[in-house]
Amino acid sequence: MKSVITTVISAADAAGRFPTASDLESVQGNIQRASARLEAAEKLAGNYEAVVKEAGDACFAKYAYLKNAGEAGDSQEKINKCYRDVDHYMRLINYCLVVGGTGPVDEWGIAGAREVYRTLNLPTASYVAAFAFARNRLCCPRDMSAQAGVEYAAYLDYVINALS
């Protein structure tokens, strides 16, 4: 699984060298942010059902036409699949917070997602809206500390940009 630490080690090994001072600074920064990332992961895990529901609701509020006949959410089964996808990505974001890198999202979420969604006639903009809502709804310190919020929002932004 890709993280800052595994990326630094892999790059140094591929070049047949020890990690540079710059490499080690990158690792140190990652380690220093670990506490905030773990706080964000804990808060997300403790409230993920509400986060997923609110994000999914925001998606269908913004793109109400998706519930029309012939659209991606024209049955309860399809609507449930949308919420399932949002849940899946939120779990991957949680894993990224724990790992300290984008590996989980890259490996289990992003690779090929846009192509799959296009094939299934699922507009990625609706997922982007769901994750943007989750990001914009975040309130520090109500939900988590400011630094934890920065870490959480960064992974939401990563998913938003990847699906855009």
From Swiss-Prot:
SUPFAM superfamilies: Globin-like (SSF46458)
Localization: Plastid, Chloroplast thylakoid membrane
Modification after translation, per record: Contains two covalently linked bilin chromophores.
Residues annotated as binding (2R,3E)-phycoerythrobilin 2: 139
Binding residues for (2R,3E)-phycoerythrobilin 1: 82
GO process annotations (BP): photosynthesis
Record has Chloroplast as a keyword: yes
Domain of life of the native organism: Eukaryota
Protein name as catalogued: B-phycoerythrin alpha chain
